[in-house]
Amino acid sequence: MAIERTLSIIKPDAVAKNVIGQIYARFEAAGLKIVAARMIHLSRAEAEQFYAVHKERPFFKDLVDFMISGPVMVQALEGENAVLKNRELMGATDPKKAAPGTIRADFADSIDANAVHGSDAAETAQVEVAFFFPGLNIYSR
């Protein structure tokens, strides 16, 4: 099994609910290490750049508006099969379809306010981690 890194964002809805610690506990219980983390309030330009892959999709404006509506907690996670493991922890994008016990089933309100973002592939993860943590701001342990 390969040690990977993935990006996780705890979105404004979950930050506002004060469940960062509960979500972090789930990462750690699953064997994922938090190797970089910071709280930020994204600017419109940053959110548009980060989600540029969705620019032509009908939900793009709503996604950007939501992501700049409050602070987010951004973290790089490291562990065996980190991308897949994080996606399993998150659950389905629509919390109504998310399996019980997943982050979205437990903390998300809607398909838009769905608590967390996670990289969808190892290649995407590299780009996303570098977007928020350029240079040597990651500390493997």
Curated annotation (Swiss-Prot):
GO terms for biological process: CTP biosynthetic process; GTP biosynthetic process; UTP biosynthetic process. Its EC number is 2.7.4.6. Its main location: cytoplasm. Disulfide bonds: none annotated. GO terms for molecular function: ATP binding; metal ion binding; nucleoside diphosphate kinase activity. The keyword Magnesium applies. It is an enzyme of class 2 (transferase). The active site is at 117 (pros-phosphohistidine intermediate). SUPFAM superfamilies: Nucleoside diphosphate kinase, NDK. Its cofactor is Mg(2+). ATP binds at residues 11, 59, 87, 93, 104, 114. It catalyses: a 2'-deoxyribonucleoside 5'-diphosphate + ATP = a 2'-deoxyribonucleoside 5'-triphosphate + ADP; a ribonucleoside 5'-diphosphate + ATP = a ribonucleoside 5'-triphosphate + ADP. Keywords: ATP-binding, Cytoplasm, Kinase, Magnesium, Metal-binding, Nucleotide metabolism, Nucleotide-binding, Phosphoprotein, Transferase. Major role in the synthesis of nucleoside triphosphates other than ATP. The ATP gamma phosphate is transferred to the NDP beta phosphate via a ping-pong mechanism, using a phosphorylated active-site intermediate. Belongs to the NDK family. Homotetramer. HAMAP family: NDP_kinase. This is Nucleoside diphosphate kinase. The gene is ndk.
